[in-house]
């Protein structure tokens, strides 16, 4: 077996890269990642919290990979141990948070959209997730809202209003998924995790939303990474096989 290459890490987005969108990882992908880890250091970085990432990648996610970065790296694990945390609450303070949440809830209350459900704001340790329809809508309602939003630009308009109103807080607004958008301080995108990877001089990042506005864009564009756009978990396997495993290393 080839020794692991020092100074090199393969870093993966979760949703759409290691798993199909919002689905669990396949046994085939887990097996492939285990093989890959024999030749390179491997890390995962997802925008979701550790609970949601564990639902997709499995409960042993923090030990299955050398690095596990949840909430874009605001919660960081190395070799199964917590090595760093940052929180929105300690960064902004309760007064500013309350001001933002109150305004947002008033805005949603006045929104005239076909249906509303519940959980309009989800408070995570590193970000707020805002959903005009409410996160506990059904999959069917989620699909319908996505279509409605494409025409009526509900989220885009709301983000414009919030961006202007709270310009003094230096927040980033990232529209993703079907029904919501994320709100976090500038610089708290996936590049945040790179501060834990100073020992690596070659960082290969793999993600599917690498276009401008996508939540993989900043880390893909970073001068510290070699960015790779993937179209599916199968494409991830193919690109990594070509890059790291080669023909003579394909079996163990």
From Swiss-Prot:
Enzymatic reactions: alpha-D-mannose 1-phosphate = D-mannose 6-phosphate
Organismal lineage: Eukaryota, Viridiplantae, Streptophyta, Embryophyta, Tracheophyta
Documented EC number(s): 5.4.2.8
Positions annotated as active site in the UniProt record: 13 (nucleophile), 15 (proton donor/acceptor)
Coiled coil segments of this chain: none
Descriptive protein name: Phosphomannomutase
Family the UniProt entry places it in: Belongs to the eukaryotic PMM family.
Protein's GO biological process: GDP-mannose biosynthetic process; mannose metabolic process; protein N-linked glycosylation
Positions that bind alpha-D-mannose 1-phosphate: 22, 124, 135, 142, 180, 182
Chain's role: Catalyzes the interconversion of mannose-6-phosphate to mannose-1-phosphate, the precursor for the synthesis of GDP-mannose. GDP-mannose is an essential sugar nucleotide for the synthesis of D-mannose-containing cell wall polysaccharides (galactomannans and glucomannans), glycolipids, glycoproteins and the antioxidant L-ascorbate.
The organism's place on the tree of life at top rank: Eukaryota
Any Pfam family matching the protein: PMM
Binding site for Mg(2+) 2: 220, 225
Annotated signal peptide: none
Keywords, ordered alphabetically: Cytoplasm, Isomerase, Magnesium, Metal-binding
InterPro entries linked: HAD-like_sf, HAD-SF_hydro_IIB, HAD_sf, PMM, PMM_cap
Cofactor annotation: Mg(2+)
Subunit structure: Homodimer.
GO CC aspect terms: cytosol
């Amino acid at each position: 077996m080839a020794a692991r290459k020092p100074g090199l890490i393969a870093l993966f987005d979760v949703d759409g890269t290691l798993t199909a969108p919002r689905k669990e990882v396949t046994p085939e992908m887990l097996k492939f990642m285990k093989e890959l880890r024999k030749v390179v250091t491997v890390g995962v970085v997802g925008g979701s919290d550790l609970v949601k990432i564990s639902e997709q990648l499995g409960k042993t996610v923090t030990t299955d990979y050398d690095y596990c970065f949840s909430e874009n790296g605001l919660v960081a694990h190395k070799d199964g141990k917590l090595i760093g945390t940052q929180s929105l609450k300690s960064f902004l303070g309760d007064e500013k948070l309350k001001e933002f949440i109150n305004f947002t809830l008033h805005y949603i209350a006045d929104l005239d959209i076909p249906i509303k459900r519940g959980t309009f704001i989800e408070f995570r340790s590193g970000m707020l997730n805002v959903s005009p329809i409410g996160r506990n809508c059904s999959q069917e309602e989620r699909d319908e809202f996505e279509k409605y939003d494409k025409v009526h630009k509900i989220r885009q308009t709301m983000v414009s209003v919030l961006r202007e109103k709270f310009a003094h807080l230096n927040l980033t607004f990232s529209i993703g998924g079907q029904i919501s958008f994320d709100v976090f301080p500038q610089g708290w995108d996936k590049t945040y995790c790179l501060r834990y990877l100073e020992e690596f001089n070659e960082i290969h990042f793999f993600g599917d939303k690498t276009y401008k506005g996508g939540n993989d864009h900043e880390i893909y564009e970073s001068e510290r990474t070699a960015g790779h756009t993937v179209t599916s978990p199968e494409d991830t396997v193919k690109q990594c096989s070509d890059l790291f495993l080669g023909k003579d290393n394909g079996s163990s």
